């Protein structure tokens, strides 16, 4: 990976921060998955969420097939962070940036795995569990669905997690070979 070339491209995007990471730095926790199961209304409703993504162990194995990655963060302002509808509506801009970064990475990589903020909203009604995903190339599972403590990774790289007042931080993790 030519990091200088990629960094020059990243400088053109409205990223809050980014960091090159190794998968050895990732911390996986069943507790993160438990939050999906008990608090997220998307649990068991899409291909991008548990249980469709597999067990935490299966997710860990899929992730650890890669050695390196790129953690990207964007921030957005909302009028009221407690308004979950407004907050979630801001994910679309982050996902668009994630797709741009993925295309940059793919120019230099032989394989990628992208995890992001999505519980997937590409289809009005997800085919889970009755039929295969209609758009697997567009769907990025949520980082947390894989049991990854993204805030721990961000902290290791000095990326501040803003979820206070009216600022929201969104993260994506693009793994590559």
How should these model regions be labeled?
Residues 3, 16-46, 50-177:
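Catalytic cores of enzyme domains
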């Amino acid at each position: 990976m030519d990091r200088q070339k990629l960094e020059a491209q990243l400088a053109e995007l409205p990223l809050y921060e980014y960091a090159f990471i190794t998968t050895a730095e990732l911390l996986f926790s069943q507790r993160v998955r438990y939050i999906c199961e008990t608090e997220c209304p998307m649990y068991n409703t899409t291909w991008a969420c548990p249980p469709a993504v597999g067990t935490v162990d299966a997710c860990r194995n899929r992730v650890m097939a890669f050695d390196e990655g790129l953690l990207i963060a964007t921030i957005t302002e909302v009028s009221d962070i407690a308004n979950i509808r407004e907050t979630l509506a801001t994910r679309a801009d982050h996902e668009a940036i994630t797709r741009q970064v993925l295309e940059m990475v793919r120019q230099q990589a032989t394989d990628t795995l992208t995890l992001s903020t999505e519980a997937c909203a590409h289809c009005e009604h997800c085919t889970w569990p009755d039929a295969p995903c209609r758009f697997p190339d567009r769907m990025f599972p949520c980082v947390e669905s894989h049991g990854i403590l993204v805030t721990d990774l961000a902290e290791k790289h000095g990326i501040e997690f803003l979820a206070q007042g009216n600022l929201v931080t969104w993260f994506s993790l693009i793994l590559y070979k």
